């Protein structure tokens, strides 16, 4: 089994290192990840300047681009084969609800899915430094082996969120839906010493809606959340409504 790993926290992030070490039990591991943090870059693809990939270890490349760039370079250039699975993570911080649209971690898995490769995004629900990623890494190994054995539905990838708890306190995984979040007061408006305004998009409390069956509902109760996401963003329930508009 050939496994491509990436992330958005950077190639030297402890979550990625823990994942790479754990995944060796399944086969050959290749790491192609950003050379610096690329959190919240979404599905950005670099088109207006060249990319560089530096080999910094055995089967380890640091790319001066986004997680999506890393998957592209890996599959189309740096690797001489198509990986059996792409695993993105382990992200330091949750990727729940609407936040998946911002996530470089999730977008890397989405990019692999666009290329027809099974993919998983894995996040640890924490913001703390020095976090222990072992439990999340072991679950990722188990899930990757299952995906390899059973496959995934077409155009589907898995978004995994693991609560930051001692392994013995983590409750069984649940298949969940993508949750919802309330966004309020995220812009910090300040004036610099020269009298010019500047703005900072700051972090806020999670403010997730506690919807039964959702990703947040699961992790807030100590469960691992596994959410199947897919590429088709069409809102099929709205098609009939729009067709009634007079402009069509």
From Swiss-Prot:
GO terms for molecular function: 3'-nucleotidase activity; 5'-nucleotidase activity; exopolyphosphatase activity; metal ion binding; nucleotide binding. Its cofactor is a divalent metal cation. InterPro entries: SurE, SurE-like_Pase/nucleotidase, SurE-like_sf. GO terms for cellular component: cytoplasm. It catalyses: a ribonucleoside 5'-phosphate + H2O = a ribonucleoside + phosphate. Its main location: cytoplasm. The keyword Secreted does not apply. Gene3D superfamilies: Survival protein SurE-like phosphatase/nucleotidase (3.40.1210.10). It is found in: Cytoplasm. The keyword Zinc does not apply. Binds 1 divalent metal cation per subunit. Coiled coil: none annotated. Keywords: Cytoplasm, Hydrolase, Metal-binding, Nucleotide-binding. Its EC number is 3.1.3.5. A divalent metal cation binds at residues 8-9, 39, 91. PANTHER family: 5'-NUCLEOTIDASE SURE, 5'_3'-NUCLEOTIDASE SURE. NCBIfam families: PRK00346.1-3, PRK00346.1-4, PRK00346.2-2, surE. This is 5'-nucleotidase SurE. It comes from Geotalea daltonii (strain DSM 22248 / JCM 15807 / FRC-32) (Geobacter daltonii). The lineage of its organism: Bacteria, Pseudomonadati, Thermodesulfobacteriota, Desulfuromonadia, Geobacterales. The gene is surE.
């Amino acid at each position: 089994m050939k496994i491509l790993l990436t992330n958005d926290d950077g190639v030297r992030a402890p979550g990625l290192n823990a994942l790479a070490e754990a995944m060796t039990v399944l086969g050959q591991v290749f790491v192609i990840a950003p050379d610096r943090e690329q959190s919240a870059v979404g599905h950005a693809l670099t088109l207006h300047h060249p990319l560089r990939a530096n080999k910094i270890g055995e089967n380890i490349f640091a790319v001066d681009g986004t997680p999506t760039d890393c998957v592209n370079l890996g599959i189309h250039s740096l690797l001489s084969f198509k990986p059996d699975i792409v695993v993105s993570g382990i992200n330091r911080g949750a990727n729940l609800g609407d936040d998946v649209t911002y996530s470089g971690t999730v977008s890397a898995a989405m990019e692999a899915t666009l290329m027809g490769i099974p993919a998983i995004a894995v996040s640890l629900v924490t913001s703390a430094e020095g976090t222990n990623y072992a439990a999340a890494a072991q679950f990722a190994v188990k899930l990757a082996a299952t995906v390899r054995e059973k496959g995934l539905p077409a155009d589907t990838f898995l978004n995994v969120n693991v609560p930051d708890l001692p392994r013995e306190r983590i409750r069984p995984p649940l298949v969940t839906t993508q949750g919802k979040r309330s966004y309020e007061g995220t812009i910090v408006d300040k004036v610099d010493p020269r009298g010019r305004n500047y703005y900072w998009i700051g972090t806020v409390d999670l403010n997730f809606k506690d919807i039964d069956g959702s990703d947040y509902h699961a992790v807030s109760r100590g469960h691992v959340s596994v959410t199947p996401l897919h590429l088709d963003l069409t809102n099929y329930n709205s098609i009939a409504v729009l067709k009634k508009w007079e402009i069509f």
